Curated annotation (Swiss-Prot):
It comes from Caulobacter vibrioides (strain ATCC 19089 / CIP 103742 / CB 15) (Caulobacter crescentus). The gene is infA. Component of the 30S ribosomal translation pre-initiation complex which assembles on the 30S ribosome in the order IF-2 and IF-3, IF-1 and N-formylmethionyl-tRNA(fMet); mRNA recruitment can occur at any time during PIC assembly. InterPro entries: NA-bd_OB-fold (IPR012340), RNA-binding_domain_S1_IF1 (IPR006196), TIF_IF1 (IPR004368). Keywords: Cytoplasm, Initiation factor, Protein biosynthesis, RNA-binding, rRNA-binding. This is Translation initiation factor IF-1.
Length: 72
């Protein structure tokens, strides 16, 4: 899959779930399940409830996503 096909949405982490997954409320009021991207894990970037994040999603499954950036 090419990177141009991915959709990016800003959102807020609403709940921490097991296995490094998070419930994220997007700005368009949808709730999805997201996990952290590999580069965020590698650089040990912590994501906590209430953090503003950027979520990358595929157009094929709009219920799951990947957190690619945590805003400061």
């Amino acid at each position: 899959m090419a990177k141009e096909e991915l959709l990016e949405f800003p959102g807020t982490v609403s709940e921490l779930l097991p296995n490094a997954t998070f419930r994220v409320k997007l700005e368009n009021d949808h709730e999805i399940i997201a996990h952290t991207a590999g580069k965020m894990r590698k650089n040990r970037i912590r994501v906590l409830a209430g953090d503003k994040v950027l979520v990358e999603m595929t157009p094929y499954d709009l219920t799951k996503g990947r957190i690619t950036y945590r805003f400061k």
